[in-house]
């Protein structure tokens, strides 16, 4: 099905399979075991037309419409209705009631929406938030669930009148000012084709019949939006959805949704695999069979090989095949997908000498002093190159550099940020190798390397820790700590004596023990174990281990650690230490 836009794809689905289930939302708030609410393709299409008709009274083609609603079918209908009306959709979470929500403030200020689509359950928080923005023309606030969504509707919008931009995907905001990535209909369509080719490379990009997408990821996040809403429509596949809260309350629900008669395609960040393996009991899985799972991609944050192994081992007795777990790399600026692991086999890890890697050279090794990295297929589309970020010259095999991406899935830039757009999306390679375009290239800000035709990812360049003159990936240090603590942690460097940087680790723990004395003894034992592990695995001496309660470490909306904020909180002594 070749289409130019998401509304055109939805219209085709409604015409070709009107009575087939399109989106099913499992509501665990009504019932602990879940209540299934389903829309067919024709119902979904009719509802988006009614939202579009309502939006036709607000602004004109190309104006922005924010979707700020709880996770549910109303969010799906609102997002698609905004596109159907020729408006630029802006996916957003519901603002936090009664408190300052800097991210929502930034997005509303930057996008200047003519309308906000919400629901009756969330409208008070939305109104309260908008009211705190005096001096600006207020957007219309529309409660989608109060519209007559199933009314007959003759609303039409010509295909050639749609703006090229589909939506603004605001970055998860490791800084306080998230930028809106300008996503076109072409970006989304091309990236869908690329990800299908990557995940189903052995079947010409075509999944088997009776496949369905399963997702609990938030719709305002790039992976949640593409996997949960865009991919089902572009492929004509049914989707089974629930909310992040439902997953966090009981991770077994994710496993239940994938243990179905259909072939499930799902996605989650690394922490979700850890959580599901740790908190799902055998009783939870009684009578469940995971043998029909097609793919579970792990992305959005650094993929830890040890976590994947624990997840695969935990659910092997319920017929989960390790080969269906696909570590993946991508970013919002490239729509969502760039690369994945090789199909048909368990994820491959390779050990590299830590000392050499710190110096920028990938040297495979065996035994101690190694950093384990997951291998990814070097994709044909999009094109990926490893580039020296200072000289803009391609790096030879085995040399660490910045990952650059080129393809029609790459956005044109950030909304109303020309200078930042040029820096990020306007990369040009000096003296490119044969078959390599000069530009423009997306400079991802991620470090990695290619060797033996495989790509390896190290982490964010700006997060690189420099301790005593050596480069260290915080992801590697955090992975070592998490093998001991199993919780969230943050590795940061802060100024020390004599112009050196020192390593500090912030570690979330539950304070357990029959008495305060027992609890303190346990915390002391964990400190000693972490200190020893960092010394033996990384040759690092940790200057300070800060043990804090769960929820203390600042994170982005997608669950990534805000390391810059951690540094500021540490320097201002704002962390409440459990062992104080």
From Swiss-Prot:
Residues 421-440 are annotated as: Disordered. It comes from the Bacteria. The keyword ATP-binding applies. This is Long-chain-fatty-acid--AMP ligase FadD28. Belongs to the ATP-dependent AMP-binding enzyme family. Involved in the biosynthesis of phthiocerol dimycocerosate (PDIM), a cell wall-associated lipid found only in pathogenic mycobacteria. Catalyzes the activation of long-chain fatty acids as acyl-adenylates (acyl-AMP), which are then transferred to the multifunctional polyketide synthase Mas for further chain extension. The keyword Ligase applies. GO terms for molecular function: adenylyltransferase activity; ATP binding; ligase activity. The gene is fadD28. Keywords: ATP-binding, Fatty acid metabolism, Ligase, Lipid metabolism, Nucleotide-binding. Pathway: Lipid metabolism; fatty acid biosynthesis.
